[in-house]
């Protein structure tokens, strides 16, 4: 099963991705983790990504796409994967579609974890990070909405909405149900 997880910062995507990957016996692919591992290992892509990150810039899509494409070449992804944090734009979604087409497969499901803005504010402020001010959090939510609206349209028929308010186990049960598991 090949699954894309979408949701705003604080929706619990990373936690649910781990739980789903464990339950389904497939890897969780997080672009953040891919960047960290490639930087730590000193790969060519890692060195290039580090230049952007050190400058405080976003890593260009072509570089992110290459990292994901390389990860999809690993044997553990043959039975499927959970993508967490990718794609973030229609451009990346189209690149992913092409990567999977070359492997004669496609995305099986897109789960959108939905949480109210008030709940997200509380969750993110509760993390106690110094940079998580209301202004910064609200801006991150706006950026997410602006980026994700076109993505939801792109994946239209594959998107299943998951109510992400509740305990970890309640949200997990809803996610499994949305996947028909």
UniProtKB/Swiss-Prot annotation:
The keyword Oxidoreductase does not apply. Disulfide bonds: none annotated. Keywords: ATP-binding, Cytoplasm, Kinase, Nucleotide biosynthesis, Nucleotide-binding, Transferase. AMP binds at residues 31, 36, 57-59, 85-88, 92, 129, 140. It is an enzyme of class 2 (transferase). The keyword Lipoprotein does not apply. Residues 30-59 are annotated as: NMP. GO terms for cellular component: cytoplasm. Pfam families: ADK. Its EC number is 2.7.4.3. Signal peptide: none annotated. Pathway: Purine metabolism; AMP biosynthesis via salvage pathway; AMP from ADP: step 1/1. It is found in: Cytoplasm. Its main location: cytoplasm. Residues 126-132 are annotated as: LID. One of its GO terms (molecular function) is adenylate kinase activity. Catalyzes the reversible transfer of the terminal phosphate group between ATP and AMP. Plays an important role in cellular energy homeostasis and in adenine nucleotide metabolism. Belongs to the adenylate kinase family. Monomer. Consists of three domains, a large central CORE domain and two small peripheral domains, NMPbind and LID, which undergo movements during catalysis. The LID domain closes over the site of phosphoryl transfer upon ATP binding. Assembling and dissambling the active center during each catalytic cycle provides an effective means to prevent ATP hydrolysis. This is Adenylate kinase. It comes from Mycobacterium ulcerans (strain Agy99).
């Amino acid at each position: 099963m090949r699954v894309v997880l979408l949701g705003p910062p604080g929706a619990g995507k990373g936690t649910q991705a781990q739980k789903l990957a464990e339950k389904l016996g497939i890897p969780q692919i997080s672009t953040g983790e891919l960047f960290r591992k490639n930087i730590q290992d000193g790969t060519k892509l890692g060195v290039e990504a580090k230049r952007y990150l050190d400058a405080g810039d976003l890593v260009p899509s072509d570089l992110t796409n290459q990292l994901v494409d390389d990860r999809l070449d690993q044997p553990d992804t043959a039975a499927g994967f959970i993508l967490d944090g990718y794609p973030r734009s229609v451009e990346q979604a189209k690149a992913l579609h092409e990567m999977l087409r070359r492997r004669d497969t496609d995305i099986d499901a897109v789960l959108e974890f939905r949480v109210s803005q008030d709940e997200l504010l509380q969750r993110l402020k509760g993390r106690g990070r110094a940079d998580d001010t209301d202004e910064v959090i609200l801006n991150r939510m706006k950026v997410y909405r602006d980026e994700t609206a076109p993505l939801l349209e792109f994946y239209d028929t594959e998107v299943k909405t998951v109510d992400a308010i509740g305990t970890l186990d309640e949200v997990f049960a809803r996610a499994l149900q949305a996947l028909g598991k």
